[in-house]
């Protein structure tokens, strides 16, 4: 289960990406999450995934 609050979700996802995964697809596959769901939730708060930085900015 992932956090619903956008600020907590941002921190959760970026921490996972930094510490455990080389990209968002790997994280989603491993955690059985839908990439689109995460991107949609975070985009509502103005965040977008940067493949170059491997984080939402």
What spans do the regions from the language model cover?
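N-terminal acidic leader/helix
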Residues: 1-23
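Short alpha-helical "recognition helix" segments of helix-turn-helix
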Residues: 27-28
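Short, charge-rich amphipathic interface segments used for partner binding and complex assembly
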Residues: 32-57
